[in-house]
């Protein structure tokens, strides 16, 4: 989610993880994408992430409220421990059953819960409405749909690994692709409903963990 968070990114010692803690969670984007993330996180009011790690620590370092969705229970627990002293940050664990590398479902026995990954974070009591959403985890196309359905104002969406993965590109029928920065797409997503002629297709995205 690269370069490590540095002391130049620190806004407040009160909200920032200590140096050793931050250094263990580096941004893993390419240099151009990492610079974009740093800039937009600094400009944001509140951040919602699908996928946690270095970007989550960056948000805390900048003093931004952040909620990160995770499907890997062990990783979610580790991130929760890291963020425990920082009430502006939290991890939203979405139980999609057993997972393997990168939080992909390990088998389909819990497929009936897949929709909880994109959607249930929006039901959290007291959720600070995000104006920036990072999509860098599972069910990526569905996460954009969930954002469109649940946001009440236009939001900026950073969609990682978008460039060469053509199976994501149909989301352009739902949101405005503003620009590409390396492999990352920058969208403006406005509140809306799924067009009737796309309903079958988009519902399928909630079962696609890519």
Language model regions located:
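Internal catalytic-core helix/loop-beta-alpha segment
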Residues: 94-146
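Non-catalytic N-terminal targeting/anchoring module and adjacent flexible stem/linker
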Residues: 1-24, 199-210
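SAM cofactor-binding core of SAM-dependent methyltransferases
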Residues: 31-101
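C-terminal substrate-binding/active-site "lid" region of AdoMet-derived donor-dependent transferases
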Residues: 123-126, 132-134, 138-210
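Class I SAM-dependent methyltransferase Rossmann-like catalytic core
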Residues: 12-44
